[in-house]
Amino acid sequence: MIAALLIAADGVPTAAGGGDGVPIGFRIFLAVLALGGLAIAAGTPFSRRLHRNRAVAALSAGGWFAVLAGIALGPVGLDLVDEGIFSGLRPLVVVALGWVGLIVGLQARWKILQAVPGVIWTWTVKDAAMSALVAASLGAIVLGLAVENAFAHPAALFAPLATLAAANLSWAPETRSLRVELSDRTRRIATLIAAAAGLSAIVAIALAGLASLPVRADGIASTLDPLLGGRRLAVLLATAAVVGIGARFLLSMVERDSPQMLVVVVGFVCIVAGVADAAGISPLLSGLLAGVVLANLSTGPLRNLESVLHRGETAGGMLLYGFAGVLVSVDSGWAPLALGFAIAATRILLKPFTLGQSMRLAREELPTNTPLRLASVRQAPLAVAVAIALVLVEDSTLARTLLTAVVIAGLASGLAAPLQSWQQRSSTAPTSDSKSDL
């Protein structure tokens, strides 16, 4: 992969910045080494031990470490990764997004979807409608105030607002970092939370990806072209179907060999994500459709395939958080800060409400002091991937502003849940015990 990036760098112009005089190929190598090292470190046993600490788990769940590392490497910090270097790293970002889409798409197996309880479908639809409406409304208000004549070009706002709405849908499915007291009831509730998060992830990628299909990106002069959207969708479906059938055949030949299976999957992702990127389509959406095709064609190899993919899930998430840090915009004024914190605040108010309603429908009573009440507050890492996909499809100031807002919302919501949980535990702790803890 690094060799391919270095070869591709021959045609990438060197951008001005902190790396003047340093060969661009070497700078790409250093950037891959730094971001790749961060991703690999996230999956080590030492990192897993660190995550047992509540503060470390909270910071990493919101992507703080990786985002700060990306900011340090980007134009805001050391300027190791400037615009020219990011162009050289683009293939790596495309493959990473395709990988994430594939993991989510593999959950959309028809037999599994048929077995999903009605309460989870109800929860997903209700939460998606409310969350998308709130996020899009906040985005329209803030951008209307921050961007001059923003509503004079509604087509330019279509994909960004849809992306912002999609980023606000899902939540982090893991509950281990919340330090929940284990019981049969909390295990059932945690399972429902994870299942609904997976379903929301599918909806989020589909919403953002499909909304970008008819957009002919040209900054503020972007236009909507339904015929272009139809052609792009046809390309996506044809690529996913043809390559999926071929991958299914190859996977059946190597299902007992994990390394060979990984090679097949990486090649599969490179093809579908690369075709999508060349056609101006979100690699995240192409990965999702490819995963759906593969999940519904495969039988035996699927279980082994999922285990192979999930081994790299944490590393992939950290890699995308790092890229998000590189791409954040510091020249957008107050808009990203206001929008990010506003979305985080609405998540704190809205998500526990929809969670509580859904648990009542499922006849599961949430304990008043359980941290699970706050589980859906934390923005899913997928939100960052959705925002990065928008930047790849439409690299504009508006797209980077929304990416920055999504990153801020993720960091804030990632801290809000543990802080509220800590406050609840502190308020219920006996006064006499507090002295002995010091």
What positions do the PLM features span?
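Membrane-interface junctions of multi-pass transporters
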Residues: 49-61, 65, 72-119, 251-257, ...
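Membrane-interface alpha-helices at helix entry/exit sites of multi-pass transporters
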Residues: 116-122, 184-206, 221-227, 302-307, ...
